[in-house]
Amino acid sequence: MLRSIVILKFGLQYLALYTHTKREACFMIIFFICLTILILGYKFYSPFVEKQAGMDSTVDTPQKRFSEGVDYVAIHPVRAFLIQFLNIAGVGPIFGPILGALYGPVALVWIVLGNVLGGAVHDFFSGVMSIKEDGKSLPEIAGHYYNVVFKGFMLIFTAMLLFFVGVVFIMSPAGLLSNLDIFKDTIFANNTFWVLAILAYYFLATLLPIDKIITKFYPIFGLLMIVMTVAIAVSLLINAPHLPVAGDFLAYFEADHAHDFLAPNPDGLPTWPLLFITITCGAISGFHSTQAPIIARCLTNEKYVRPVYYGAMMCEGIVGCVWALAGI
């Protein structure tokens, strides 16, 4: 609680020194308030959610009961957190919030409310269901509690959705990498090269035991994403021009700027419902449930479910807020 208050106090003091216009002051204040709410949500709301799930640190996890050196491999909780964070984050909390920035600061509000009340809870219970059901996937759990027909439906539905998500998660990074200036006039500037390379990596990461590729490289990439997000946030603060006072938050709405917060889309597109389907990753995304079994099979204690699953989604919310602010 004290740390959250210190962060908010620092943010407001910073704004009083370094912001320039009432419009920018308002956006930055909303940003710091959102970060504080995310941290407070993890500190106070996530223990309540954990209590409802009936987590028991004394029972054996699937990793201890089914350890076979392939999928059920013990992973340190910090590594597990970074892997889960990278699994759910990717390009989603970057592209979505940047597009959602067209709707103004209300995008930040949606990310925070969706994350604390929906996304983080969803991810946490996805992990809970999997670890309580021997590390099974969502279709397998559905088949266990319903019937084989429903299991088949869930398998087909999940496969279709993952196909479309997979296409985006292949084409997007391939396009970014092939357009880098350092690869100009080389084979690496070919988009097809990166598509095939990413596909090959996907197959290897899927077929090989989890401790061969995923546990070695994912934590590094997850840490790099956190460092990148922090660097962007610091850059936004450093490059912000000189501001008057944090009290501009109220003055901003007293002036003729309320429309910037409520309906700023340049194409006149309505906030409801388009904002909520523009920004999913960072706020709430059902696709995250497909990633839950990967780490649920590797946790050595149920007490790690909350920091790994709820914590990873909270961090994704912070990533979304930073990119939304950059877009705004």
Can you describe what each PLM-predicted range is?
Residues 23-24, 37-94, 301-304:
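Membrane-interface "cap" regions at the ends of multi-pass membrane proteins
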Residues 75-92, 235-242, 253-326:
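Hydrophobic, membrane-embedded alpha-helices of multi-pass small-molecule transporters
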Residues 100-106, 131-137, 144-149, 296-306:
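Juxtamembrane helix-boundary/capping and inter-helix hinge elements in multi-pass membrane proteins
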Residues 166-170, 174-183, 192-194, 205-206, ...:
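Hydrophobic alpha-helical segments and their helix-loop junctions in multi-pass secondary transporters
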